[in-house]
């Protein structure tokens, strides 16, 4: 597994590659042209993850909830980069919209200050960008149905671009948000088998999980443990999962 030092910081895309490898998900380096036919369950999972997070963003905007907007934007980046890793689409490469600085690397260099009046001053602009993100997801869904990996690549990058534009409009450092989401996502791991067993028992008590088969397996480091939905393959959180904290970014 690649170990990035402080002097060689991973890009956002590379960080998600670290997550995928640690949790036993693919981190491919070449286009997976046959993935639509050979692994449709994985394709569906990746689409569903993006759809879920885009829906969270729509809800956050409708509720004028800045904290949830930050959270949703960070999560959208994560699942879009995740789909890129699985499909072998290097989202560190320059995307289709050349006028926009490359998402995730290098970082934007500006002083950020969240505009707490954005819903009164720029609501229509925010809404337009969120609509663009939703529309692009629909285009992505269609491209997957058509098994067109070139268009899938285009739409993934376009979603990233619009999310970065939204973060710029609202006034927050999306790369910092992403870093916090990444640290939080890595805390989904159980540190030992005892934590994994406790987490399995914990899910048995949660509403909505009555018919869900939750299992655990060793992570690739052969030390920590991954909790997952046995039917869908979706990664689930450790009982000791730590939510990302954005409170200081909203001050």
From Swiss-Prot:
SUPFAM superfamilies per UniProt: all-alpha NTP pyrophosphatases (SSF101386)
Protein name: Uncharacterized protein L479
Gene source species: Acanthamoeba polyphaga mimivirus (APMV)
Domain of life: Viruses
Lineage of producing organism: Viruses, Varidnaviria, Bamfordvirae, Nucleocytoviricota, Megaviricetes
Signal peptide stretch: none
InterPro entries linked to this entry: NTP-PPase_DR2231-like, NTP_PyroPHydrolase-like_dom_sf, PRib-ATP_PPHydrolase-like
Coiled-coil ranges (or none): none
